[in-house]
């Protein structure tokens, strides 16, 4: 069983560094997708700190995708971008664990027993409500 940690990267280098260091012992592959435009279609330059990736080079699967999809609405564009994660998990087996989250949503895998998770799909959503 392998664990894939998959994210869409949008320039959060300091948070990415924390994530990579925190999950390094538990994760087999880090799949990082970066686009040449934002979810809203604004063109942007590559922002990843390649020096940061060197320490984790044997685990990193980094893809910079510079394609013009600005003709579609932001929700479809975000969906298209998230679907590009498939590039980094093509060799995944049915027993592998694939985590997809935002860069700043860092799971604590050290306390979990993932060996008995089985063939199930788990979805976790975190919502913070501000009660007055």
Language-model segments: residues:
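Short loop->beta transition adjacent to catalytic acidic/histidine clusters or analogous donor-positioning motifs
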Residues: 2-4, 24-38, 57-61
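A short acidic (Asp/Glu
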Residues: 15-20, 41-44, 107-115
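N-proximal low-complexity "stem/linker" segments adjacent to membrane-targeting elements
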Residues: 1-25
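Conserved beta-strand scaffold positions in the cores of enzyme catalytic domains, especially
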Residues: 30, 62-64, 121-123
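Short, well-ordered alpha-helix to beta-strand connector turns
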Residues: 27, 57, 95, 118-119
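Conserved catalytic core of nucleotide-sugar-dependent glycosyltransferases
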Residues: 75, 105-132
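Short His-Asn-centered micro-motif
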Residues: 5-11, 33-34, 100-103, 124-126
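Active-site-proximal specificity loops/subdomain of glycosyltransferases
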Residues: 35-100, 109-111
